[in-house]
Curated annotation (Swiss-Prot):
Site (Cleavage): 1018-1019
PTMs per UniProt: Cleaved to release the mature protein from the outer membrane.
Biological role: Serine protease with enterotoxic and cytotoxic activity. Internalization into the host cell is required for the induction of cytopathic effects. However, the serine activity is not necessary for secretion and internalization into the host cell.
Provenance organism: Escherichia coli O44:H18 (strain 042 / EAEC)
Activity regulation, per record: Inhibition of cytotoxic activity by phenylmethylsulfonyl fluoride.
The gene coding this protein: pet
Name by which UniProt lists this protein: Serine protease pet autotransporter
Length: 1295
């Protein structure tokens, strides 16, 4: 029977001895004998023994002890600074160490895996075979086939298979150090400069909870942990030294019968890891006086047993042939060895090379072990269809084994080690894999695959490499591992993953893998997805109960959902349970006490008080529990069609959504749990189960991205945080924001429906990485409805919002940002134009009689009658807007305003109105009114009420100010008066005065025709000048010119001018006459502080050039040009105008080329250009004032005089002519007159004459006999308008 020894003082030996369970007052345990009713595991009790609770649940909950041992709840491996809430509401903090990984403990806790096929326990467990002879890890049962023990109660065991579920406990604890060194290395600071060694024990002995007996021993569900501190490193006992510890006084879990052999762990500060100190031996004392004794790990004995199972085979890159019980390498042959128990050993291969099997090989309890960083091939000799069977395959780090034989079909292949197993042919058996990589290189490589432990990877290297069935023959147990699709597509009905230790990935960066999950009923995938993957859930017909519920991390290229619901949520943290079965229907006299009910009852009162019934309900998780693990979902695009998307609690989602005929619910209150989570894999590891429950569970959820939706609906629930940071469009898709939700749109949002909000809605511009904020536009055709008291509607930071707002509740509205909130903000020029210089612009009506509005640096364009309870305006503008003769009224109970403007429209009888019912206060506010013109002979003044406020309101609230309207300065004449018990501001008339600056801006715009004419003039005679330099014949030519110019008032322009043409030479008596035709295209841009725009011009002309033998010449040209103009003005409300115009040109130039030498010359010249420029006229209204701006047709006459000098340089096959010129260009006629007309009368601005000095340098080159190339640079100075820089290049081909 399994003993937990009690340690007593012996007078005979003079020391402590281990006393058996049969002695008086010693706690003990055995198997209850098989009765006729049933076989059960029980505890032998003695009436004269007092049993203390092994788990004290007066302070901590029962579940906490189980969570720790099973790495559930907060006790995830590696977690630090862990604390739990005690029943009195205080926190209990565990040592500031990472939580150990207890996966190396066997399910019943009586033994501990140390890796490979080895486990440790205590020697006296041999008397109870149910304790450690059979060990379960995950879904695999292992059997002890050999062991070695010591007199100090230590036992090292050899198991029948390599353990795949764990890499085993670290056994590097050095007990041979002196005590102080051990304390220094493994101790924890406890204050006052002292260190203590603190550790954990994991076991499932005879379990009780504060007097609640379970009658259970070796029950996996009841695996629990103890927290202790070591009190004696070398307690002298029978058989040798033991380590003595005492349990923590708060988190108290005493050692009991059945805990013999359970692992004890301490932390190695030097290596930063947990190590196995030893195995539990026995106890002395009871309750708070209990001391537990630990047998230290014995590395010497462990190595001795391992050596019994090692046969080294050094292949050294040769071939090892195995057959007939022998191994042959070259000329050397050795027998396959067995140990003294006639058990096969592990064949430990080294050196790399080939292994050839001549026949089936059954190593029994021995396996294949391969060393690190080598390449091996295992194959059959010839074409033999041979198989291998054994304890498993262990491949060292960096090594790859090409496996080209089969494993025995009546057994499961166990694979461990960090190296890779490349399976080349189908195995027709099952695989259990833990560490390293298994590459599947054949169709249906294994019937089923069991993936355990976490670090392992299964990689696809062939089509249909997995098995068949709903789960494709692959099962991921606790901590799972990776499935690498490696560029292959894979379809599942369900993925058999028990927790988030499972990841499906694609390491192939060039070929995307499609992962299809086609569950026909509700299903939760607990694992993760990452890599180059597209995730699909497509059904042929719409099914509302075929939800794909994702509660692991998802990072995919895209997700596509059709005809089925998709749920993204966090995961309710898994916890330990007290019994796998939900109820115990067996009578107590046969099956023992129903401890689950007793625990629930014992903790009921504190659970009712703390609302923590979920802690005692024997469920893996509960919808009401507060601890949920947040999951991240990342994708580029999520496409859903005829489907629904739910983003529930603890989901953090980023990506763009495209939805058609679908429902989107962000912050869905419905969540899903799986009562078998963490326990989904059953049997031998190749079956899967789920028990899905749903209900209300509200927690924070997040979505960041954009939504493009058509014919659907979007609901955003409580505690949802939504950030729309890319453009979103909702077409026939209603958006509802519920109370408690927080939605921020930082990019444009357009909807053809309405937006209902009971939560917080914020519309804002987008902040770029440079710190600059770019504007965003928001348009809701159906408007915005605020449905809850306290609902917040905020627009700020370059938001331009359009859509009516209404609310019957006490909502809060805010437009704009105070200067202190955006002092670091940089605004783009586009934003300043779009927002009229304000931080925020809103256009629409507000009907919210119970709501308040705060405006800071904001513009409100009031488009309909509006009503508010309170309006607070600072540095803002309320601009009444609407159709012709449709006026609006803004009614508020209280108005507080400062440094703001209210701009109204009126006719001779009506006007927009501001009505303040209860209180109007503030100062330094402008009251502005659009201009109106009185018609006929009505000489009476106006009498139009604009503002009505409570009686005796200060007259200083509003003041008037001169506005520039049209080309005039307009001052409305407004008086305040007490009328009908109210303070009223009344418009009585206007005062208008011409504004010279506005007229100057208009004149600058209208002068564009003259500057365009001048640009064409400067390019008019270029071709004829070239003819004199090239001594050419008939030919075709092309020219491109680019230049910039500037004038006063901030005017600047630039142009690109292209000419093409052809001409012919006529040799006459005493002269050469060239005649030709030209086509031109000009693209010019011009602007100033007041306007900007462009002109595109096309033209055609004829020219002639007569060059006399004497050196005299005459050039003539005629040309027509058509102009298409588009200009945008920022003055007088002109806006953008498109118009066409044209011009005619007639030019003549005379000169004389005087040759100083044969290659140098001087050329005086004179030019006269006459033309016609068409006029234009614009008529419009600016703030109610009629405006006209016109310039008439005019005929410019421009003269130019100057002198050019040049010199030719030539060689055998080339000639270059360089030239420079200086001239003066001047207007003989003033350019056109501009006529401006507005309410202050007509203004005529006469055109002025201008003149400028011209300078140019250039050259022409003969590249070949019939090819010429020219280049020229120009600029002008001393004019009102000057060419800053110009360059032209020409090319001619002579026939």
């Amino acid at each position: 029977m399994n003993k937990i020894y009690s340690i007593k003082y012996s007078a005979a030996t003079g020391g402590l001895i281990a006393v058996s369970e049969l002695a008086k007052k010693v706690i003990c345990k055995t198997n209850r004998k098989i009765s006729a009713a049933l076989l059960s595991l029980a505890v032998i009790s003695y009436t004269n023994i007092i049993y203390a609770a092994n788990m004290d649940i007066s302070k901590a909950w029962a579940r906490d002890y189980l969570d720790l041992a099973q790495n559930k709840g907060v006790f995830q491996p590696g977690s630090t600074h862990v604390k739990i809430k005690l029943k009195d509401g205080t926190d209990f903090s565990f040592p500031a160490l990472p939580v150990p990984d207890f996966s190396s403990a066997t399910a019943n806790g009586a033994a501990t895996s140390i890796g490979g096929a080895y486990a440790v326990t205590v020697a006296h467990n041999a008397k109870n075979k149910s304790s450690a002879n059979y060990q379960t890890y995950g879904s695999t049962q292992y059997t002890q086939i050999n062991r070695m023990t010591t007199g100090n109660d230590f036992s090292i065991q050899r198991l029948n298979k390599y353990v795949v579920e764990t890499r085993g406990a670290d056994t590097s604890f050095n007990y041979n150090e002196n005590n102080q060194n051990i304390i220094d290395r493994y101790g924890v600071d406890v204050g006052n400069g002292k260190k203590e060694i603190i550790g954990f024990r994991v076991g499932s002995g005879n379990t009780t909870f504060s007097g609640i007996k379970t009658s259970q021993t070796y029950q996996a569900d009841l695996l629990s942990a103890s927290l202790f501190h070591i009190t004696n490193l070398r307690a002298n006992t029978v058989g040798g030294n033991k380590v003595e510890y005492e349990n923590d006084s708060y988190f108290t879990n005493l050692t009991t019968n059945g805990d013999s052999g359970s692992g004890v762990y301490v932390f190695d500060n030097k290596e930063d890891k947990w190590v196995l100190l030893g195995t539990t031996h026995g106890i002395i004392g009871n309750g708070k006086t209990q001391k537990t004794y630990v047998t230290p790990f014995d590395s010497k004995t462990t190595n001795e047993l391992k050596q019994l199972f090692i046969q080294n085979v050094n292949i050294d890159n040769n071939t090892a042939t195995i057959g007939g019980g022998k191994i042959t390498i070259g000329n050397t042959t050795q027998d396959i060895e067995k140990n003294k128990n006639n058990q096969n050993k592990d064949l430990v291969f080294s050196g790399g090379g080939k292994i050839s099997l001549k026949e089936n090989l059954d190593l029994g309890y021995g396996g294949f072990i391969f060393d690190e960083n080598k390449k091996y091939t295992v194959s059959a000799e010839g074409n033999n269809n041979v198989t291998f069977k054994g304890a498993g395959i262990d491949i060292g780090k960096g090594s790859t084994v090409d496996w080209n034989i089969k494993y025995a079909s009546n057994d499961a292949l166990h694979k461990i080690g960090e190296g890779s197993l490349n399976v080349i042919q189908a195995q027709n058996t099952n695989l259990k894999t833990g560490n390293g990589t298994v590459i599947l290189g054949a169709q249906k490589t294994f019937n089923n695959i069991y993936v355990a432990g976490g670090p392992g990877t299964v990689q696809l290297n062939a089509e249909n490499a997995l098995g068949e069935g709903d789960y494709a023959g692959i099962f991921f147990t606790e901590n799972g591992g990776k499935l690498d699709l490696n560029g292959h597509n894979q379809t599942f009905k369900k993925i058999a993953a028990t927790d988030s230790g499972t990841t499906i990935t694609n390491s192939n960066t060039t070929k995307e893998s499609v992962l299809s999950v086609n569950n026909q009923n509700n299903y939760i995938y607990h694992g993760n997805v990452d890599g180059n993957v597209r995730l699909e859930h497509h059904l042929d017909t719409k099914q509302d109960n075929a939800r794909l519920i994702l509660d692991g991390d998802i990072q995919a290229n895209s997700i596509s959902i059709k005809n089925a619901p998709l749920v993204m949520q966090g995961h309710a943290t898994d916890h330990a349970i007290f019994r796998t079965t939900k109820t115990n229907n067996c009578p107590e006299f046969l099956c023992g006490v129903d401890w689950v009910t007793r625990i629930k009852n014992a903790e009921n009162s504190v659970n009712q008080k703390n609302k923590t019934t979920y802690k005692s309900n024997n469920q893996v998780s509960d919808l009401s529990q507060p601890d949920w693990e947040t999951r991240k979902f990342r994708f580029d695009n999520l496409n859903i069609e005829d489907s629904s998307l739910s983003i529930a609690r603890n989901a953090d989602v980023e990506g763009n959504i495209q939805a058609k005929n679908s429902v989107i619910n962000i912050g869905d209150k419905t969540a899903y749990i799986d009562l078998y989570s963490g326990k989904n894999i059953t049997g031998a590891g190749f079956t899967f189960r789920q028990d899905i429950k749903s209900g209300d569970s509200i927690g924070e959820s997040k979505f960041t991205g954009g939504i493009m939706a058509t014919d659907g609906s979007i609901s955003i629930g409580d505690k949802a945080i939504v950030t729309l940071n890319t453009v979103s469009s909702l077409d026939r898709t209603a958006l509802t924001i519920h109370k408690g939700a927080n939605v921020t749109a930082s990019s444009s949002l357009f909807t053809t429906s309405n937006i209902k909000s009971g939560g917080d809605l914020t519309l804002t511009g987008a902040t770029e990485s440079t710190g600059e904020i770019t504007p965003s536009m928001f348009y809701a055709a159906g408007g915005y409805e605020l449905t809850e008291d306290g609902a917040n509607f905020t627009a700020k930071n370059q938001a331009s919002v359009t859509g009516d707002i209404k609310s019957e509740k006490a909502a809060k509205l805010s437009f704009g940002s105070a200067d202190k909130d955006n002092s670091a903000t940089r605004y783009s020029q586009f934003a300043l134009a779009m927002l009229d210089g304000f931080d925020t612009s809103y256009q629409g009506s507000i009907k919210a009689a119970q709501s308040s509005l705060a405006m800071n640096n904001a513009l409100w364009k009031v488009t309909g009658n509006s009503e508010l309870k309170k309006l607070n305006s600072t540095g803002s503008m309320v601009l009444f807007n609407g159709g012709k003769n449709i006026f609006n009224t803004l009614t508020v109970d209280e108005l507080t305003t400062s440094n703001s403007a209210f701009v109204m429209r009126t006719n001779t009888q009506q006007a927009d109105q501001l009505i303040v019912k209860n209180k109007l206060e503030g100062a330094n506010n402008l009251l502005l009114v659009d201009f109106i013109e009185k018609k006929g002979n009505d000489k009476n003044g106006l009498n139009i009420d604009l503002v009505k406020a409570p009686e005796n309101t200060s007259k200083d609230v509003f003041k008037t100010e001169t506005q520039t309207i049209g080309f005039s300065d307009v001052t409305p004449e407004i008086k305040q008066q007490e009328k009908d018990g109210k303070s009223v501001w009344t418009l009585t008339g206007y005062k208008t005065v011409a504004n010279a600056d506005a007229a100057k801006k208009a004149t600058s715009l209208m002068s564009g025709g003259y500057k365009a004419f001048l640009a064409e003039v400067n390019n008019l005679n270029k071709r004829m000048g070239d003819l004199r330099d090239i001594n050419g014949e008939a030919g075709a030519w092309a020219r491109i010119m680019s230049g910039t110019g500037s004038a006063g008032g901030g005017f600047s322009d630039n142009y690109t001018h292209v000419q093409v043409g052809a001409d012919n030479k006529h040799e006459l008596d005493g002269l050469d006459l060239f005649t030709g035709v030209t086509m031109t295209y000009t693209d010019s841009h011009a602007g100033s502080d007041a306007f900007s725009g462009e002109t595109k011009s096309v033209g055609a002309g004829l020219y002639a050039s007569a060059m006399f033998e004497s050196g005299a010449y005459i050039d003539l040209i005629g040309k027509y040009v058509h102009h298409d103009n588009e200009y945008t003005a920022t003055f007088a409300g002109l806006g953008t105008r498109d118009y066409s115009s044209h011009s005619w040109y007639a030019g003549a130039e005379v000169g004389y080329r005087y040759h100083v030498t044969d290659s140098a010359w001087i050329e005086p010249q004179a030019e006269l250009v006459y033309g016609a420029v068409s006029g234009k006229q614009f008529s419009w209204k600016d703030q109610g004032m009629n405006l006209t701006m016109k310039d008439k047709d005019f005929n410019p006459l421009i003269g130019r005089t100057g002198v050019d000098v040049g010199k030719s340089f030539s060689g055998k096959d080339w000639k270059v002519t360089a030239r420079a010129g200086l001239g003066y260009q001047f207007d003989l006629f003033a350019n056109g007159e501009t006529v401006l007309r507005d309410a202050s009368g007509e203004k005529r601005i006469k055109g002025e004459k201008d003149g400028r000095m011209l300078m140019n340098v250039g050259l022409n080159a003969e590249i070949r006999d019939n090819v010429r190339f020219g280049l020229e640079f120009e600029k002008s100075a001393f004019g009102k308008y000057n060419v800053d820089n110009a360059i032209n290049a020409n090319f001619r081909y002579s026939f």
